[in-house]
Regions:
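NAD(P)-dependent short-chain dehydrogenase/reductase
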Residues: 81-103, 117, 127-188
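Conserved sequence/active-site signature of Rossmann-fold short-chain dehydrogenase/reductase
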Residues: 5, 75-76, 148-150, 189
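Conserved catalytic Lys-bearing alpha helix of Rossmann-like short-chain dehydrogenase/reductases
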Residues: 48-54, 121-129
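Flexible cofactor-recognition loop at the NAD(P)H-binding site
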Residues: 29-30
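Conserved Rossmann-fold cofactor-binding substructure of NAD(P)-dependent oxidoreductases
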Residues: 2-20
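Conserved Rossmann-fold NAD(P)-dependent oxidoreductase catalytic core, especially the SDR/UDP-sugar
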Residues: 23-26, 53-115
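Short alpha-helical oligomerization interface
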Residues: 33-50
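Conserved mid-core alpha-helix of short-chain dehydrogenase/reductase
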Residues: 9, 53-56, 128, 188
Length: 190
């Protein structure tokens, strides 16, 4: 269990393995919006500084290793809420003719929107990953996913709604649904 804020501990790992590191998939994060608002300095240090630590060490010790960053759709702020959704029986969807029907790509602006503290810290991380790719030649990519779930998802109220919904159902605890008349807007990615 390594804290990505601890540069010296990370550096020992990179020094030990150097170019034998063939791929970096960076998915470490502080994922809670509410927690980020309560502790913005800690949130920024985990999401932004931790990413910067990994990028710098990749550049120094494992330059040829592709760097895959698990970002978030929260870097777009509230811009996705402005999309022209149409209501269906069980969910909201965007028109098949809309340029974002197959998903939002990097053409959607990160600017001129309201971000959460979490969104800002991940936005910084996302942008610095891009800069290391463009300016330093690292092989970088950012995946801006939404509603990620899986077998190790914590099922916490503040993040991970699908696993929390299942957990609430099993324990017969109340689960509150906010917005969009209780209909699904985003797809879950497993």
């Amino acid at each position: 269990n390594i804290d990505i804020r601890n540069y010296l501990v990370l550096e020992k790992i990179f020094q030990k393995y150097k170019n034998s590191i063939k791929l970096i998939i960076h998915s470490a994060a502080q994922p809670s919006h509410d927690w980020a608002k309560k502790k913005p300095f800690v949130d920024f240090n985990i999401n932004a500084l931790g990413t910067l630590n990994l990028l710098n060490l990749t550049k120094r010790y494992s330059y040829n290793a592709p760097f895959i960053f698990m970002s978030t759709n929260k870097v777009y702020g509230d811009n996705p809420n402005l999309l022209p959704l149409r209501e269906l029986n069980s969910r909201w969807e965007i028109s098949k003719k809309h340029k974002y029907f197959r998903g939002i790509d990097e053409s959607m602006s990160l600017d001129n929107s309201v971000h959460s503290f979490f969104g800002v810290s991940k936005c910084y991380a996302d942008l610095i990953v891009q800069e290391y790719g463009k300016n330093d030649g690292l092989k970088t990519v950012c995946f801006r996913a939404s509603c990620i779930t899986g077998p190790n998802h914590s099922g916490a109220k503040l993040h991970g709604f699908l696993s929390y919904l299942v957990k609430s159902s099993i324990t017969k605890k109340k689960y509150s649904i906010f917005g969009y008349k209780g209909k699904q807007v985003r797809d879950n990615i497993h």
